[in-house]
Structures are given as C-alpha cells and as structure tokens.
Amino acid sequence: LVVMTADHGGAHNPNLLKKHKIPAGGWDGKGAMKKANEELAKQFGVQGNLIKDMLNNFFYLDRELIEANKLSWDDVKAAAIKELKKDPEAQYVVDMEHIATSNMPEFLRERALNAYCPGRTGEIMFITHPQVFTWRFGDDYIGTTHSAWNPYDAHIPLLFMGWKIGHGNTYQPTKIVDMAATVCALLNIQMPNACIGTAILPLLEST
C-alpha cells in the first residue's frame, strides 16, 4: 500500500493574474507593523514597539514592555487589532485568544485554530485577501508561494495505490489527518490515540 500527498499547494503568480485583470498583490507586513506601532506609541504614551515582531501572518505583542508601562494587555491588543484592520490588504485580523467568538466563517476559524499554539504563535493573526502574497514583489517576479487557506493552496493531491485499492476518485472534502484513519479501516484495526481524522468512505467502497 502506497499513500502519497503534499504539505501545500501553490498560489498562482500574481503578476500573471494582474495581466488577466484578476485582483492580486503583495502585503507589506513589516510596514503594517511599523505603522501600527507608531499609532500605539501615541495612544499609550510609550517609547518602544508594543508589537514586538511578526512571523507567518502572526503578530507578537511585547509583554515585558506592556507590563513595564503598567498597561492593560487586553487594551493594547484591541488597539493593535484596530490599527491593523486599517490595512487595505486585511480580510480578517483576529485575536487568537478569542477566535471562537470571531466573525470568521466556521471553516476558516477551524483552520486558523489548527495553526495556533499558545505561547509559540503570536496573539494576533492577519489574514490577507485571496491572491495577496505576504511580501512585496516587483513587476518581473515570476515565482509563487503558499501558506494561505484558499483552494489554490489548500487543495492538494492525495493518492492511495496498491493493496485493496480500486480505481476511482472522489470530490468529497478530505484532510491529511484522514490518511491514518483510512489505513486503519483498511487493516480493520483501532486508530492511533491521537488520530483526529475519519476514514475516506469512497475509497473504502472501491475495495
């Protein structure tokens, strides 16, 4: 039995899309952070950056600076989110501690939660509009990237071949975590303790 997949897809080249009049672009995350920090410094009367850093669409607040200035963590976070939402490339700017009550669609909220690890990822997640890269690029750029929730990145191959696998395909949504559950169903054994997927029924029906 052979199972093959990929960890991500790839975005269409934004310059090519723009040539065909399809909205696309690049987001200056560091610039957005700098602008937000300038406004936060004025609002709270502090010297230094209340947003400490950004990585992979997450913004990290400076807890030490907030505590040193006796500021409210929640007030600073809310103000940072308000400033970041002013960015024209912002589709959603989310407080990860309270994402369960956000106004994001359920499927997108679930994916954002899957990317969140308290203490390691940032407190604020910035989600750009579709086909917006997370950096600026020139008119001669011909590459691509990934790390988006959109179908061009999230739609990836998943192939089962060999023992007990018949010919077929499915348009039913599946996830990488479904692989373990499906293999266990083929073997008629218990799923692993940490398995959170479900068996891919169309594949089992082809056996």
Segment roles from a protein language model:
Residues I81, K85-E89, C184-P192, E205:
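Sec-exported extracytoplasmic/periplasmic mature domains
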Residues G9-A11, G122, G162, N188, ...:
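Glycine-centered flexibility sites
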Residues T101, L113-C117, I124, T170-P173, ...:
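Cysteine endopeptidase catalytic domains of the caspase/legumain-like
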Residues F133-F137, H167-G168:
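Short, solvent-exposed loop/turn elements at domain surfaces
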Residues W27-W73, G143-L187, L201-S206:
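Substrate-binding rim/cap in mid-to-C-terminal beta-strand-loop elements of soluble/periplasmic
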Residues L1-V132:
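Secreted, luminal/periplasmic, and some membrane-associated catalytic domains
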Residues R109, I142, G197:
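Conserved glycosyltransferase catalytic-site signature
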Residues F137-G143:
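Conserved alpha/beta core surface patches that mediate binding of polyanionic ligands
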